[in-house]
């Protein structure tokens, strides 16, 4: 889930 946040800086 938080991986999506890594994609969105």
UniProtKB/Swiss-Prot annotation:
<keyword id="KW-0418">Kinase</keyword>
<dbReference type="GO" id="GO:0005737">
    <property type="term" value="C:cytoplasm"/>
</dbReference>
<keyword id="KW-0963">Cytoplasm</keyword>
<keyword id="KW-0067">ATP-binding</keyword>
<keyword id="KW-0808">Transferase</keyword>
<dbReference type="GO" id="GO:0005524">
    <property type="term" value="F:ATP binding"/>
</dbReference>
<keyword id="KW-0547">Nucleotide-binding</keyword>
<comment type="similarity">
    <text>Belongs to the acetokinase family.</text>
</comment>
<protein>
    <recommendedName>
        <fullName>Butyrate kinase</fullName>
        <ecNumber>2.7.2.7</ecNumber>
    </recommendedName>
</protein>
<comment type="pathway">
    <text>Lipid metabolism; butanoate metabolism.</text>
</comment>
<comment type="function">
    <text>Catalyzes the conversion of butyryl-CoA through butyryl phosphate to butyrate.</text>
</comment>
<dbReference type="GO" id="GO:0047761">
    <property type="term" value="F:butyrate kinase activity"/>
</dbReference>
<dbReference type="GO" id="GO:0019605">
    <property type="term" value="P:butyrate metabolic process"/>
</dbReference>
């Amino acid at each position: 889930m938080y991986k999506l946040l890594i994609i969105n800086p």
